Amino acid sequence: MQLTFIETSIFSRDRSKYFDDDEFRRFENCLLENPETGDVITGTGGCRKVRWKRQGTGKSGGIRVIYYHISTNHRLYLL
């Protein structure tokens, strides 16, 4: 499956605080394999929250990413 990843300005600004380039590619690949991963956030119209365990950290060192997947046009918005 092909997806276009679109980052909000806030996500782009803060991404380097949580992901290095390799880790971010692994995260994107995970979403490419299963864009419906994560829990739907009630009342958002379909936004999802996914937990991501960063390499070298325990579960508590992981991060949460909010995203919205539009399957009809193959876009995934990283919020």
For each of these PLM feature ranges, what is it?
Residues 8, 25-29, 38-41:
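N-terminal targeting/export leaders
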Residues 15, 36-37, 59:
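Glycine-rich, flexible loop/turn motifs
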Residues 21-24, 60:
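Amphipathic alpha-helical transducer elements in NTP-driven molecular machines
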Residues 29-32, 68:
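Generic alpha-helical structural context detector
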Residues 35-36, 74:
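Short alpha-helix boundary/capping elements
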